């Protein structure tokens, strides 16, 4: 039944029935742990890979001995970095040793390797003052993948791909004649026997003896025209290096370097783990019948007799005693199974080797060699350490390739299984650490080339490590990654939830991933292995659907990058649910039968029912209790954080729940946050982990509290911890970040206690919207098509008011004609316009500004003409005449207004780092209070979104019997067809809870049910169906039917009408077509498109049509004359020829077509060729205006580039691949700057 639960400082009444076992992990540990691994181990791995760098003679040796991040010499704190546009980073210092083998001389130096960006405690990076997030990438794991297709005759064709982390791919395929081919590194296919010969089995007999008798193998040998190893090597060489003279030596070294050289072929730890898992012999011989006696080679005992079935334990024992070939009987045929000869080292060594830290299988022949030659513990350990790269090779080895071929042969006998590439056991995460490591590796390998060159050029006697190392390529590759990688994204900071979700995002796009165009349905689909790992609900709508996902609430990422989810172990003896929690990857989970978390169990953990609903791979079954092995840990483990915040999610349709999850991330922080009456209980955890709230670093007592600082006296040593609170700062998205203390002086706080509320949080719980009294009722058609009718009270009482802060900057640069100057003295500007400008020429804080007002007065020198001798003389005698300057002040853009809240000034003199050529930089921050207004977008948490259509006076709104007017009216028709019934249940429960004074927690899949809601309504004294008589506010008459009324949690979304409304009379024009630009950012016009033209044609409005296509668009002369005529009140002149028509003719002429324009009498009409002729006709100087337009366009473009954040916050691929390299087809004429082609355009 309903019971109180303490959430931070608030008590919620919870309807959950299940006891939660196990804690939810820290929600941003994906980021923190990964970066931590990179600093501790990842960097070292890269240095180990590259050590040592030798010159071409092999005399000089350069080694990286160790490194440290100098955390004491960080220049600025996180806040200062944001203010100064700098990067939050620490210097990386590496200890380098140079050995000269001839002289035996060793030089050691500490070399500075550039500033390395550091992760903040919130899991973000500050790059050039902007807060960015590195999104984790979902990629195919390295490994061996088998696939099967059925051809038109119905025979099964098997294919395989061997994918390394980096290096050459091997692809196997079978054709309908049963011949197996191989492609090496995407080249043309060869019969697979050629590869086998080249690797060492030269003759037909050797191949058949090694791989066993097989029809497909014989067919392939017949097709193969080589007969010896040498011929096979030459054949492969010809395919891979066409045009070069083939020799056996060069062919051998080619294959060696292609596959067996760790520098060029890297499996990575994951690859080795997946190879050993897939190719291990024990999986393929389990439950098969042995065709020969299997004898342990060490002891000689018979493990399995001929004709006996091999069970799982025996199979593992067979593998671990070093047997790599087993004959099994399939349909009266004998088949030889070959493994890759890796064994579990712990089964072969009796003493403790945990200090060696070997978790993987090891290569048996090397281990056997060590065990045969050494006997005592110490020397065996020493040898294992020395030979670790031979025991666990980083590259593929011959045995691996033989095992893959054998697996391919075995599939046609149903030995082994094919793989599903969309299974999360075959997809892994590359998080920050690994992405950074790969980038650092690229930088180091570029540096290695430079070092080698310098070693040969410089004098070997006086050479030093410092002189050899050039850190540029390393620093550049790191900078490039953070600045422009597709996975380094401008953080979505609209509210704390969007911040948290962005850090937990998983993207299949990006370098080495998929591209939107190529991704099919299968990759985007929900897969059974997503359960508890990736949210099946939260993903963007649109072209990225299913490619961008969110991590589930309880999921963790293991050392190999696979996502794991926790399960409770069921005691195998008495079938009791224990509190042991096991984290499992997707392929481990497939081996077990797992019960649901809401399966009824008694207080001792025993199942109440005899039959239990379980998941087994992709099936949902009902099985007896005896078969259950694990149990889910919590009902919300399968969804992400945002989805887990939707109450009654179980009663919503999936597509609406998807919209609900996505829209919560777009909720704007309001002036007074209010936690939801009906919550799900995860709000507190989400807010504390999102990183927007200050927490106590140590336990202690609050000593001082003010609006912008909290001091806590530590219990441990009596020292003081200071916490600065952020006041009215601008977020990345222009919303307002403001923190308010929630502790009082003298309060005792434990470690990790919340000290203050941030944006959109209320007592430490995420509070994205407001609890609003609403009813499902239509009102005079004002809620047609999802529109919303709201009460004036919401405007008057600032219920949905939010603060938005915009940043504008002006810089004074050096120009060719002299420096720009920031000054109050601006030409042709009256005193009225300068009333709020101080003596420096900068607006004062607190001033109220409207669009067009000056923020920073700035003048730029104009070009001066050459002076005559007389003028120069006069100038010298009477002093400087006023210099020619033009006004380039920073003004408030169209449609913006507000109050100046902050001004920051950066100058060279104060030692601020400014870009070259900039002398002074001024930033102004304008804050706006935006009340809710018609046209704003609002939404509930169930995907029920709408636009405000009318603000009604409070007295006209429908009212309840007790006289309270509704605050919002929603259309009842928005519910049934969309099937998001959760909103109705939320409204009923909200009604009862507000009367009872409760805050409620109804967790997803484990919340209040219908009977609970009825009980609450009854307890609160309302009717059980939650409906009430409503009265019309205008007449006082009751409406005909009773209406569902209650409290719904409603959000105001970031799509505000103030940002979208826009109007233009005249403005900038595109350079080539001379048509008005489009879009609000360019101050563009509304496009009168093809279909609109048809409409006017159909209507017969010829003059209107002609006007729209000429003087209102691209008839250059006509539009100037028309404007003049309107101003002077004259008649509008005849339209001329549109510029786009001239462009069309030019394009046709460019295709070598002679195009002439003729009149009725077949006389050629001369079109004006250039803009200059137009100018002559108008007697104006067009040059200046065009340049100004270009300046303006350039500035707009720069600003857009800086903000490279797409408005639709569902899609975070800031820099899409298309933006990086424009396709030639996509370059339209608009992109060409015709000024580069001289005057004759």
Curated annotation (Swiss-Prot):
Compositionally biased spans, kind Acidic residues: 1171-1180, 1191-1241
UniProt KW keywords: DNA-directed RNA polymerase, Nucleotidyltransferase, Transcription, Transferase
Region of interest (Disordered), ranges: 1171-1241
GO CC terms of this entry: DNA-directed RNA polymerase complex
Gene Ontology MF term list: DNA binding; DNA-directed RNA polymerase activity; ribonucleoside binding
Enzyme Commission numbers on file: 2.7.7.6
InterPro entries given in the database record: DNA-dir_RNA_pol_bsu_ext_1_sf (IPR042107), DNA-dir_RNA_pol_bsu_external_1 (IPR019462), DNA-dir_RNA_pol_su2 (IPR015712), DNA-dir_RNAP_su2_dom (IPR007120), DNA-dir_RNAP_su2_hyb_sf (IPR037033), RNA_pol_bsu_bac (IPR010243), RNA_pol_bsu_CS (IPR007121), RNA_pol_bsu_protrusion (IPR007644)
Transmembrane segments: none
Gene3D superfamilies tied to this protein: 2.40.50.100, 2.40.50.150, 3.90.1100.10, DNA-directed RNA polymerase, beta subunit, external 1 domain, DNA-directed RNA polymerase, subunit 2, domain 6, RNA polymerase alpha subunit dimerisation domain, RNA polymerase Rpb2, domain 2
GO BP terms in the entry: DNA-templated transcription
A Pfam family that the UniProt record links to this protein: RNA_pol_Rpb2_45
Reactions mediated catalytically: RNA(n) + a ribonucleoside 5'-triphosphate = RNA(n+1) + diphosphate
Known role: DNA-dependent RNA polymerase catalyzes the transcription of DNA into RNA using the four ribonucleoside triphosphates as substrates.
Family recorded in the similarity comment: Belongs to the RNA polymerase beta chain family.
Subunit structure: The RNAP catalytic core consists of 2 alpha, 1 beta, 1 beta' and 1 omega subunit. When a sigma factor is associated with the core the holoenzyme is formed, which can initiate transcription.
PANTHER family: DNA-DIRECTED RNA POLYMERASE I SUBUNIT 2 (PTHR20856)
Descriptive protein name: DNA-directed RNA polymerase subunit beta
Species of provenance: Clostridium botulinum (strain 657 / Type Ba4)
Phylogenetic lineage: Bacteria, Bacillati, Bacillota, Clostridia, Eubacteriales
GN (gene name): rpoB
């Amino acid at each position: 039944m309903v019971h109180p639960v303490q959430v931070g400082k608030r008590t919620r009444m919870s309807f959950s029935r299940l006891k939660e076992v196990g804690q939810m992990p820290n929600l941003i540990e994906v980021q923190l742990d990964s970066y931590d691994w990179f600093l501790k181990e990842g960097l070292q791995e890269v240095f180990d890979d590259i050590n040592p760098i030798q010159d071409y003679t092999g005399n000089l040796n350069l080694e990286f001995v160790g490194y440290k991040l100098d955390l004491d010499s960080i220049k600025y704190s996180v806040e200062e970095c944001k203010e100064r546009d700098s990067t939050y980073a620490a210097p990386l210092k590496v200890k380098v040793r140079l050995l000269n083998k001839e002289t035996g001389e060793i030089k050691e130096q500490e070399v500075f390797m550039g500033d390395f960006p550091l992760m903040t405690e919130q899991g973000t990076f500050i790059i050039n003052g902007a807060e960015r997030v590195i999104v984790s990438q979902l990629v195919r794991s390295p490994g061996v993948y088998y696939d099967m297709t059925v051809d038109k005759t119905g025979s099964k064709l098997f294919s395989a791909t061997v994918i390394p982390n980096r290096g050459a791919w091997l692809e196997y395929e079978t054709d309908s004649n049963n011949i197996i081919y191989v492609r090496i590194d995407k080249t043309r296919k060869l019969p697979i026997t050629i590869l086998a010969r080249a690797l060492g089995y030269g003759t037909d007999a050797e191949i058949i003896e090694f791989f066993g008798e097989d029809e497909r193998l014989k067919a392939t040998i017949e097709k193969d025209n080589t007969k010896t190893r040498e011929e096979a090597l030459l054949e492969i060489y010809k395919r891979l290096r066409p045009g070069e003279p083939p020799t056996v030596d060069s062919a051998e070294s080619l294959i060696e370097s292609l596959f067996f050289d760790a520098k060029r072929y890297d499996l990575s730890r994951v690859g080795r783990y997946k190879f050993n898992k897939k190719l291990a012999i024990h999986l393929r011989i389990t439950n098969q019948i042995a065709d020969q006696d299997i004898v342990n080679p060490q002891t000689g005992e018979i493990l399995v007799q001929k004709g006996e079935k091999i069970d799982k334990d025996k199979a593992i024992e067979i593998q671990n005693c070093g047997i790599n070939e087993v004959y099994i009987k399939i349909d009266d045929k004998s088949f030889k199974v070959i493994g890759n000869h890796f064994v579990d080292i712990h089964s072969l060594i009796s003493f403790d080797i945990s200090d060696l830290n070997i978790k993987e299988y090891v290569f048996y022949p090397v281990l056997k060699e060590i065990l045969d030659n050494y006997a005592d513990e110490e020397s065996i350990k020493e040898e294992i350490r020395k030979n670790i790269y031979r025991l666990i090779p980083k590259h593929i080895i011959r045995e691996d390739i033989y095992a893959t071929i054998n697996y391919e042969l075995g599939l046609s006998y149903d030995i082994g299984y094919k793989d599903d590439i969309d299974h999360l056991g075959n997809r892994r995460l590359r998080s920050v650490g690994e992405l950074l490591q790969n980038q650092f590796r690229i930088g180091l390998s570029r540096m290695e080339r430079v070092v080698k060159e310098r070693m040969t050029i410089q004098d070997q006697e006086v050479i030093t490590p410092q002189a050899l190392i050039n850190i540029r390529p390393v620093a550049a590759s790191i900078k490039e990654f953070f600045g422009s990688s597709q996975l380094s994204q401008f953080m979505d900071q609209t509210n704390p939830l969007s911040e948290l979700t962005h850090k937990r995002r998983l993207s299949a796009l990006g370098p080495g991933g998929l591209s939107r165009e190529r991704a099919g349905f299968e990759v985007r689909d929900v897969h059974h292995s997503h359960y508890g790992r990736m949210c099946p609900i939260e993903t963007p709508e649109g072209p990225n659907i299913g490619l961008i996902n969110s991590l589930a609430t309880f999921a963790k990422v293991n050392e190999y990058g696979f996502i794991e989810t926790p399960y409770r172990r069921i005691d195998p003896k008495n079938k009791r649910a224990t509190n042991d929690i096991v984290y499992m990857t997707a392929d481990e989970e497939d081996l077990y039968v797992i019960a649901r978390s809401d399966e009824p169990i008694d207080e001792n953990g025993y199942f109440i029912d005899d039959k239990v609903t379980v998941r087994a791979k992709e099936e949902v079954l009902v099985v007896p209790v005896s078969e259950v092995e694990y149990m889910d840990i919590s009902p919300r483990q399968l969804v992400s954080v945002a989805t887990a915040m939707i109450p009654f999610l179980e009663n919503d349709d999936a597509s609406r729940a998807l919209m609900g999850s996505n829209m919560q991330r777009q909720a704007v922080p309001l002036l007074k946050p209010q936690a939801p009456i009906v919550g799900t209980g995860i709000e507190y955890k989400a807010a504390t982990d999102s990183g927007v709230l200050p927490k106590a670093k140590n336990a202690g007592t609050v000593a001082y509290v003010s609006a912008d600082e909290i001091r806590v006296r530590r219990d441990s040593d009596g020292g003081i911890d200071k916490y600065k609170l952020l006041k009215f700062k601008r977020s990345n998205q222009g919303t307002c970040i403001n923190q308010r203390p929630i502790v009082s002086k003298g309060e005792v706080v434990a470690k990790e206690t919340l000290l203050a509320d941030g944006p959109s949080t209320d007592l430490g719980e995420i509070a994205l919207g407001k609890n609003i009294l609403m009813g499902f009722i239509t009102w005079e058609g004002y809620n047609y098509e999802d529109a919303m009718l709201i009460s004036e009270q919401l405007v008057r009482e600032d219920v949905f008011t939010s603060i938005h802060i915009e940043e504008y900057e002006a810089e004074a640069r050096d120009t060719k004609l002299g420096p720009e100057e920031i000054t109050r003295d601006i030409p042709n500007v009256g005193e009225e316009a300068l009333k709020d400008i101080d003596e420096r020429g900068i607006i004062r804080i607190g001033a109220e500004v409207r669009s067009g007002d000056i923020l920073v007065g700035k003048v730029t020198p104009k070009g001066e003409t050459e002076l005559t001798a007389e003028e120069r003389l006069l100038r010298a005698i009477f002093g400087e005449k006023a210099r020619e300057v033009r006004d380039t002040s920073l003004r408030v853009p169209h449609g913006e207004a507000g109050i100046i809240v902050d001004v920051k000034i950066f100058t060279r003199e104060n030692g601020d780092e400014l870009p070259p050529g900039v002398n002074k930089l001024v930033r102004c921050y304008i804050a706006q209070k935006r009340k809710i207004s018609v046209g704003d977008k609002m939404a509930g948490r169930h995907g029920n979104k709408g636009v405000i259509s009318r603000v009604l006076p409070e007295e006209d709104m429908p009212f309840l019997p007790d006289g309270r007017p509704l605050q919002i009216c929603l259309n009842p028709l928005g519910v049934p067809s969309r099937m998001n019934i959760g909103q109705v249940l939320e409204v009923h429960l909200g009604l009862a809870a507000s009367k009872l004074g409760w805050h409620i927690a109804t967790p997803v899949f484990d919340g209040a049910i219908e009977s609970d809601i009825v009980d609450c309504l009854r307890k609160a004294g309302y009717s059980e169906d939650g409906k009430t008589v409503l009265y019309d506010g205008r007449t006082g008459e009751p409406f005909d039917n009773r209406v569902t009324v209650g409290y719904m949690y409603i959000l105001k979304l970031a799509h505000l009408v103030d940002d979208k409304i826009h109007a233009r009379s005249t403005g900038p024009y595109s350079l080539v077509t001379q048509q008005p630009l489009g879009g609000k950012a360019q101050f563009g016009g509304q496009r009168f498109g093809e279909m609109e033209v048809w409409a006017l044609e159909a209507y017969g409005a010829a003059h209107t049509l002609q006007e729209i296509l000429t003087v209102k668009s691209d008839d250059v002369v006509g539009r100037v004359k028309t404007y003049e005529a309107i101003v002077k009140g004259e008649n509008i002149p005849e339209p001329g020829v549109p510029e786009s028509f001239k462009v069309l003719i030019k394009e046709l002429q460019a295709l070598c077509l002679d195009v002439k324009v003729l009149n009725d009498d077949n006389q050629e009409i001369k079109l004006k060729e250039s803009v200059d002729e137009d100018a002559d006709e108008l007697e104006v100087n067009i040059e200046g205006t065009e340049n100004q337009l270009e300046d303006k366009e350039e500035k707009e473009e720069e600003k857009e580039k800086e903000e490279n954040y797409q408005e639709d916050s569902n899609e975070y691929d800031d820099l899409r691949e298309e933006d990086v390299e424009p396709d030639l087809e996509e370059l339209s004429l608009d992109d060409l700057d015709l000024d580069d082609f001289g005057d004759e355009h």
